A protein has these predicted regions:
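Catalytic-pocket segment enriched in acidic/His residues
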Residues: 2-14, 26, 30, 36-38, ...
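Extended, compositionally biased flexible segments
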Residues: 1-96, 101, 108
């Protein structure tokens, strides 16, 4: 199955699928839930584009590899190159869209890797580990500090969050990321 960025109306977004920059423990409540310390700066890791699948297709959860943890996330699609330390206006101008995403983790494998002080990307980067819905155009979102995200499973709400609860808000977070490496059109935060 081939993934292609698209807007809610079905219009294809002609950016190549790039990297997926993820932020671990960006919500204090989630860090506490996992008995992890709340980080003092963004905890960044990257998923390869090969792990992305569209939400509208069926996707498989590799239960044979152990417990699979899921988290609803707010995905931000980058539409213009960003590097070094862009100002907030440049970052806002480079945002092409927002979408709900599902971040899947092989939790048992991640715990084993962490216990050995090994990198744990393989527990978060398997094929299908990043499920992306269609994007809402960036300029359609008026308040980046009030984007809701909810995950229900069989009618039961499992997660109900909002961007206002982020330890690192969207624009400063993207600025921080650009201080470490460039973002290109098609990259997803």
């Amino acid at each position: 199955m081939t993934y292609q960025h698209q807007y809610l109306d079905g219009t294809r977004i002609h950016f190549p699928l790039g990297k997926v920059v993820c932020v671990g423990r960006n919500y204090a409540e989630h860090a506490k839930e996992l008995n992890n310390p709340v980080p003092t700066e963004p905890l960044l890791f990257i998923k390869p584009g090969s792990c992305v699948v569209p939400l509208d297709d069926s996707f498989s959860i590799p239960a044979e590899r152990g417990a699979v943890h899921y988290e609803a996330e707010i995905a931000v699609l980058i539409g213009k190159p960003l590097s070094k330390t862009p100002d907030a206006e440049e970052v806002l101008d480079a945002i092409s869209g927002f979408a709900p995403a599902l971040d899947l983790t092989l939790r048992e494998l991640q715990d084993q890797l962490k216990a050995k002080s090994y990198p744990w990307e393989v527990a978060k980067s398997f094929d299908g580990a990043c499920v992306l819905a269609a994007f809402v155009p960036g300029d359609a979102v008026e308040d980046l500090s009030d984007i809701g995200i909810r995950l229900s499973l069989n009618g039961e709400v499992r997660q109900d969050g909002n961007s206002r609860d982020m330890l690192n808000p969207i624009l400063p977070l993207i600025q921080h990321i650009c201080g470490h490496f460039s973002l290109q059109p098609g990259d997803v935060i």
